[in-house]
Amino acid sequence: PTLPLVYEGIRLCREHGLGLVLAVGGGSVIDSAKAIALGVPHEGDVWELYLSKKQPQSDPLPVATVLTIPAAGSESSPNTVITNEETRRKLGYGSPKLRPVFSIINPELFFTLPHRQMANGISDMMSHIFERYFTKTLHTDLSDSLCEATLRTIMKNARILNGNLNDYNAWAEIAFSGNIAHNNLLGVGREQDWGCHAMEHELSALYHVDHGAGLAVVTPAWMKYVSPKHQEIFVQFAVNVMGVEGSFREPSAIIREGISRLERFYRELGLPTTMEELNILPGDFPLMAEQAVSVRGPVGGLEKLDVRDIQAIYRLGCSNLQHA
């Protein structure tokens, strides 16, 4: 979703005195609609809100959606992400006032989606759960289990869609899962992470890669980097989500197998798992890392990541290190 389109939408809403913004599409369309709704009553440049993260002084226009791509979960979330192509920045913004007033989710609308969009959507919704699941918060048994069950449901039905994009029941499960993944039910009472999203946004901003594809590269690399300090939650993930046998083996071996199975799942869907597949040059890692921390400082919750950490994670996404 790009800023010039948002500006045009704001102009049209003001010109015609519109009272509601209806988004018919996927996450990019819905996020654009939210930005338009935010900008119509705002005095000044709506991009300033994305930079400052300040809550709006005036109520945004109501937003409603007809979902055509289950992925971002924007149809039930209070969040929006916009790309400023001029400054090559991709930033998010959130306000309870941006949660859609209603959303229509009909699985039959997904039958014509290209396979690539299906795969990207699966990666995105899984990442929304990962950002909540991997936490330092203790005594989260119920929400742990809800996260794990939703991840297993997504993977099971993604494999069905991998062979048949017209399976109504599989799409229904995926659409409901994508909704649950990002309406924050799974994040209640948990310190959340959002490091992978912050790092991936720089890939999308600089190289215009698909968000889901970028996450399929960044997420396993991040897991490899932070898991040695947080073995318990990553063993739990490997056993309860990826089906690794929970034996008395060295925890690091269980974790490695869990991450390896996640990468194989991504590749099964045709997603990239290396920076090379995205044609991203290591020479841009320093710039992207600096950009990732430029607004709010170090990223992440489970582990705070500075510029040096982020560059190391980007390097772990390179095949020559990944398969060494």
Tell me what each language-model feature is.
Residues 132, 136-261:
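Active-site segments that bind and position negatively charged phosphate/pyrophosphate groups
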Residues 41-139, 236:
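A glycine/threonine-rich phosphate-anchoring loop and its flanking beta-alpha core
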Residues 1-44, 160-171:
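N-terminal small/polar loop signature for handling phosphorylated ligands or for N-terminal nucleophile
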Residues 21-24, 64, 181-182:
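Short glycine-rich or small-residue beta-strand-to-loop segments that form or flank ligand, phosphate
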Residues 1, 28, 38-39, 68-71, ...:
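Acidic, glycine-rich active-site loops and adjacent beta-strand->loop/helix elements
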Residues 7-10, 96-103, 151, 189-197:
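Acidic-glycine-rich active-site phosphate/pyrophosphate-binding loop
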Residues 234, 241, 245-324:
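C-terminal charged capping/lid subdomain of soluble metabolic enzymes
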